[in-house]
Amino acid sequence: MSVVISIDVGTTRVKVIAFSKNGKIVAISDREVSQIYPEPGWVEQDPLELWEAVRKSLSEVIQQVGLKEINSIGITNQRETVILWDKETGRPVYNAILWQDLRTEDICRKLSEYSEYIKENTGLLLHPYFSASKVNWIIENVNGVKKDIERGKVIFGTVDTWILWNLTGGKVHKTEPSNASRTLLFNIKRLEYDDELLKIFRIPKNILPEVNESSSLFGYTDKSITGVEIPITGILGDQQASLFAHGIRELEEVKNTYGTGLFLMLLTGSKPIIPERLLGTVAWVINGKVNYAIEGSVLTGGACIKWLMDRLKLIKQAADTEYLAKSISSNEGVYFVPAFSGLGAPYWDASARGIIIGITGRTRIEHIARAALEAIAYQTRDVIEEMEKETGVKIKILKADGGASQNNFLMQFQADILGIPVERPRHVELTALGAAGIAGIYSGMWKSKEEFIEDTREVELTFSPEMKKEERELYYSKWKDAVKRAMKWSML
């Protein structure tokens, strides 16, 4: 049986999965990866730990399926995270600075005069979330990096580039548009790096990876790692990968990945839309054809459940929240705004901070757990309403994936608060499957995206709205009030 191997490098886990042509998982190996919090608002990872997790998991999957069965490899990854490394030694010059890291707020504030140019050409906002200011921080703050860049020793990449470089034994330094378009350095209209943006962020062009099409031959694995050379034929950022696997119809359907954050995407076609409070981005490029998307990125989604579990010790496992939420009939006025790293779309307030409001003497763990799940659904509605404003099109269905999509209370409440159906696919590993699809189309496993979707997509459950409109709007208006209380908090 021929398989495509997908390498999925997330924020908290690395997964390597072998998929058959019908999308079934033939083999899987995964490892948890740790985060480092050196200071408040800073989030890092050890790039060598990421690579080691990939290397070990890939080795285990290859042992399970056998080298002869492997058609190709695809890569998907957490986006915006930056790594700079010495291309001679392969050693990172600093830890990976993660997407949710806020240390570059001041850098972004000082560059505010360029925000219009940045928005118009990248589709993104001038915000610490994206890669460019993080790269600038490393260049300006880590000893010796500037000189080593001048000597041509140091190169930059997002996580996909770092994994690709290591897989190929340091031979290939490339990326693709779905990742490049998240750096604030890439012009999404011209599909190339923008010299003006490089000047704004003081980043030399010679450290940047070459940009391939998303579905193309990036290179071959080094024999010392995989035993034989295996073609690497597809790369997509994690959210674009899940969008690809959902088979979303343009402008009618939205996908939401319920992960550490919440990532909503709407496919918009062959011309870029530059939205006001959301993000315009590249979905993928296949056979010379570019597809664009609008994205709403919510910084804290499932992470608020992890916080209840790891920091407050209120629950033992994430699944406990479903039972707790269902055990009470309402939130009793308790709202939780989980602005741990500020607020992302559509507010983009880096100075917002988390609050739990409406607490009384009757408030119990059940109310806090329910408020956390409801916050995920409210933030999703915030983004969908903004998408509808930008496009003038009413969204007909939400397609869900990610860990928290397995929570039935959340999915039902999501349908209720939106007033539209929420569809959950049978396949849990949508992000990894999307990377397999983009790779397998180039390597001949599937003839087209349409064939890939037909072979692999299967709906497990559809949640239909049951809540009355008046009740829905009352809940949501209270949420909006709570958000106002959380905004600008660190500036007060």
Curated annotation (Swiss-Prot):
Glycerol binds at residues 79-80, 129, 238-239. Its EC number is 2.7.1.30. The lineage of its organism: Bacteria, Pseudomonadati, Aquificota, Aquificia, Aquificales. ATP binds at residues 11-12, 260, 302, 403. ADP binds at residues 11, 15, 260, 302, 403, 407. It holds the Pfam family FGGY_C. Belongs to the FGGY kinase family. Sn-glycerol 3-phosphate binds at residues 11, 79-80, 129, 238. It catalyses: glycerol + ATP = sn-glycerol 3-phosphate + ADP + H(+). This is Glycerol kinase. GO terms for molecular function: ATP binding; glycerol kinase activity. Pathway: Polyol metabolism; glycerol degradation via glycerol kinase pathway; sn-glycerol 3-phosphate from glycerol: step 1/1. Inhibited by fructose 1,6-bisphosphate (FBP). GO terms for biological process: glycerol catabolic process; glycerol metabolic process; glycerol-3-phosphate metabolic process. It comes from Aquifex aeolicus (strain VF5). The keyword Nucleotide-binding applies. Keywords: ATP-binding, Glycerol metabolism, Kinase, Nucleotide-binding, Transferase. It is an enzyme of class 2 (transferase). Key enzyme in the regulation of glycerol uptake and metabolism. Catalyzes the phosphorylation of glycerol to yield sn-glycerol 3-phosphate. GO terms for cellular component: cytosol.
